[in-house]
Amino acid sequence: SRDFGFLRPHLQGHRIIAMDYRGRGKSDYAEDFTSYNIVREGTDAIELLDHLRIDKATVIGTSRGGLITMALSRLHPERLKGAVLNDIGPDVAAEGIARIFEYVGKTPPFGDLEEAAQAVADGHKEAFPDVPFARWREQTEFMWDNAPGGGIAIRYDARLRDALTGQAGAGEAADLWQLFDGLRDMPLAAIRGANSDLLSPETFVKMQDRHPSMIATTVPNRGHVPFLDEPESLAAIHALLEQTK
């Protein structure tokens, strides 16, 4: 839920519900790590809406959250007013997946958050060339916690790596284009980082071809993922919210 920390101040007047998916943040870890999949996580989101007595919502999905949003559009389209996909599409580039597997589920090799922030800043300087260190320092606090015995700790169940590896090995990848097509009949915005290694320009064009009314925005000097407080991101989000209010 901390992924939306930079966006939240720009959505005054809107009710914001930012959930920690199972096994992340302050949510409990699942007994069965195979439940870390987009269908189960989407069901969790619907159960949260039920608990809050919310009939329909506009969903903003960043990265994996966007995959969950696509799944929801097929499983529970009646619950969605519209959607924003942040740097994710039905074709996920292998280069980006490989980069994610370099760190997912692993204990970060840093002594403290300051060292971690410097490493993150150095690692993202090509894809995010104009982002000041202070932003990366804040982003680091969203991503990790100080560990009690020193060093830093991830804020999610390390077995997420096992779930992702198992799904890939078993060939359980969903037909994401079929899921994406579930968004055809509702307002949709898609945001892409110009330097993204997960959402290619070619996939972005295909998305527009299949959803001609989609609000499509490319954010300069951003990789995976835009922070969502960039002017281009905010313009797309507010335009979408105008359609769903």
State the predicted function of each range.
Residues S1-Y29:
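Conserved HGGG/HGGXW glycine-rich cap/lid loop of the alpha/beta-hydrolase fold
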Residues F4-G5, S27-F33, E95-G96, P201, ...:
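Conserved catalytic-core motifs of eukaryotic protein kinase domains, centered on the activation segment
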Residues I17-R24, G89, P220-G223:
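Short beta-to-alpha linker loops that shape the active-site pocket of alpha/beta-hydrolase fold enzymes
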Residues V39-A57:
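Conserved acidic catalytic loop of the alpha/beta-hydrolase fold
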Residues D55-G96:
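Conserved hydrolase catalytic core segment
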Residues G111-G166:
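Conserved alpha/beta-hydrolase catalytic His-Asp/Glu region
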Residues D145-D209, T218:
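Conserved serine/cysteine hydrolase catalytic core
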Residues V219-P231:
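Catalytic histidine-centered segment of alpha/beta-hydrolase-like enzymes
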